[in-house]
Amino acid sequence: MLEFENIVYIDRRIGEVFAFLSDFENIPKWNYYVLDVKQLSESPIGVGTTYHQVRKTDEQDFRITEFEPNHTVAVKTLPQSSPDFARKFTLNAEGNTTPIRDEWKLGTGRPTILERLIGRRVKSAVAHNLTKLKELLEEGRVVLQDGIQVTV
């Protein structure tokens, strides 16, 4: 199991950042590897809300497991999904800046030695996606790694 975290500082108020980040249908706007995310449950966003995610090479269903408005949102894949992952965003207000701690637990199904080798690449790719999130929220537009331009 890979475990890592990244931190990014976004020059926007916490409420604005949390609203965008906790709506997981926004992920394709800042993560080029995720093609689509759809909310499956009809309830308002909160603990228990489920989503279906389509990435370039696979698909997963996941559920919100922790939700504290303007502070924390965490998700975990449902049992039938692979790869298995848990992700937690923790936000704190620092004036008009919002630091986001992005914590991951990712089951790769690979031996520990191989996990260590790919771990740095995965962490780096996630960090790069977070810089795209920062740019999108601060500038209102971003060009993703695959050349797609997104505006909000």
Map each language-model feature to its residues:
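A short, structured loop/turn motif at beta-sheet edges
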Residues: 14, 42, 65-70, 90-99
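Hydrophobic/aromatic beta-strand elements that line small-molecule binding cavities or substrate pockets
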Residues: 6-8, 60-66, 77, 85-93
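Short beta-strand segments that buttress and anchor functional surface loops
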Residues: 49-56, 73-80
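General beta-strand recognition
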Residues: 52, 61, 72-74, 99-101
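Hydrophobic ligand-binding cavity/cleft-lining segments
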Residues: 1-41, 132, 138-139, 151-152
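Beta-strand/loop substructures that line and gate deep hydrophobic ligand-binding cavities in soluble
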Residues: 79-128, 133-135, 144-147
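Eukaryotic helix-grip
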Residues: 67-74, 131
